[in-house]
Amino acid sequence: MNVLAKYNQVRSSAQKIRLIANIIRGKKALLALQILSSVKKKAALLVKKLLKSALSNAEHNYGYNKEVLIISKIFVNSGSSMKRMMPRAKGRADRILKRTSHITVILSDIKKNPEGYNGSKSTP
């Protein structure tokens, strides 16, 4: 069974969060938490928060052991953008887009999804 966790309207662009998501995709969930602890980016904190929530959901709601879970899927979609104006010279204004994104993590059991597990690969 797959365990799904979502984090919607995150105040960071999808491009920045995808850098972190690509690092941990396919890894064991507990290993991914250790990796995220060592990355010094705001996006790493956001993904770590979501991953902890997904692990808690798996343990509490479905009775899974945390050691056997892998991140089978993680994807980041663009959310809505807040439009702001920045004053410029001669009475003009430029538009600033404050982007948001939606993060989705799907955890699965190693035994049930062995082809999705690539935790033995080294990260580039």
Swiss-Prot record:
It holds the Pfam family Ribosomal_L22. One of its GO terms (biological process) is translation. GO terms for molecular function: rRNA binding; structural constituent of ribosome. GO terms for cellular component: cytosolic large ribosomal subunit. The keyword Glycoprotein does not apply. PROSITE patterns: RIBOSOMAL_L22 (PS00464). It comes from the Bacteria. InterPro entries: Ribosomal_uL22 (IPR001063), Ribosomal_uL22_bac/chlpt-type (IPR005727), Ribosomal_uL22_bac/org-type (IPR047867), Ribosomal_uL22_CS (IPR018260), Ribosomal_uL22_sf (IPR036394). The keyword rRNA-binding applies. Keywords: Ribonucleoprotein, Ribosomal protein, RNA-binding, rRNA-binding. Belongs to the universal ribosomal protein uL22 family. This protein binds specifically to 23S rRNA; its binding is stimulated by other ribosomal proteins, e.g. L4, L17, and L20. It is important during the early stages of 50S assembly. It makes multiple contacts with different domains of the 23S rRNA in the assembled 50S subunit and ribosome. Part of the 50S ribosomal subunit. This is Large ribosomal subunit protein uL22. It comes from Buchnera aphidicola subsp. Cinara cedri (strain Cc). The gene is rplV.
